[in-house]
Each structure stands twice: as C-alpha cells, then as structure tokens.
A protein has these predicted regions:
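Short acidic, low-complexity intrinsically disordered linear motifs used
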Residues: 1-9
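Beta-strand/loop-dominated core regions that host nucleotide or nucleotide-derived cofactor-binding catalytic loops
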Residues: 11-41, 49-133
C-alpha cells in the first residue's frame, strides 16, 4: 500500500483465508485428489497454496497443498470464492490426513481464527443435521 493509496483510502485486499472441513469425499474424476466441503472465510482462489492443519490431533504436522478446483452452492465451477459454503478440490489431497474439522488456511492466520473455523466445522459436521452443502 503506497502513500497515494493511503491518502485516498484505497485499502489493501485481505489475502488470508480460513476454511474448516465439514465433509470429505473422494474425487471420482481423480482418485488422488480429495473433495472437501465447508465455509470459507476470506477469499480462496483456484491455484492457491494452503496449509492443512489438524487442530484435534497431536500427531499430525501441518502440510501444504494446492487448490485445484472450486464449486459454489449452485454447483458451478468458479475461480474464487468468498464467505460462502463451497466445494474445494485439493490436488493430491489423498496423501494428506484430511478429515472433518481439518482447517485449510493461508500463512499468517491467527490461532483464534484457526480455532473458530475448527469449532464451526466440527459443530456443522456432527450437530447440524445437514448433509453436504
């Protein structure tokens, strides 16, 4: 953000993203990829590299993965998604230990946001009574 932007109020776009996994499914088109469903906070793009964190596990180390596809609630393929329930395809996601409650996020996300996303995903996955998105 330069001086000109500062003086005239142009704000830098928030680049952080947090996504709690509420459901996981195999990808029928590519068995190595993994499809997950959940609520995205921030903006996620196809091609983004995200960190996979399992807050409920003492053994899993954070891992990095790439988002290969996004689908909105209307089942339309999109290039980016923000603040909505979405279907995310994780490239080579099968090799990562992803389950309900796993959090996908960008660098620099606070511990509070990670925990809030984890709790939201767990509550929706096990207590909301909804299936899918």
């Amino acid at each position: 953000m330069g001086l000109f932007d500062f003086l005239f109020g142009k704000k830098k776009e928030n680049t952080t993203v947090v996504f709690g996994v509420e459901e996981r499914l195999p990808n029928p088109n590519n068995l190595e990829d993994l499809v997950v469903i959940g609520l995205v906070r921030g903006t996620i793009h196809v091609g983004d590299e995200v960190i996979i964190t399992n807050l409920g596990s003492d053994n899993d180390k954070p891992a990095k993965a790439v988002i290969s596809a996004l689908e909105d609630a209307n089942k339309a393929q999109v290039k980016k998604a923000s603040g909505d329930n979405v279907v995310v395809t994780i490239k080579d996601g099968k090799k990562h230990n992803v389950y309900k409650g796993t959090v996908l996020h960008s660098e620099g996300v606070s511990e509070d946001k990670l925990r809030a996303s984890y709790l939201y995903a767990i509550l929706n996955a096990f207590f909301s009574g909804k299936v899918g998105y």
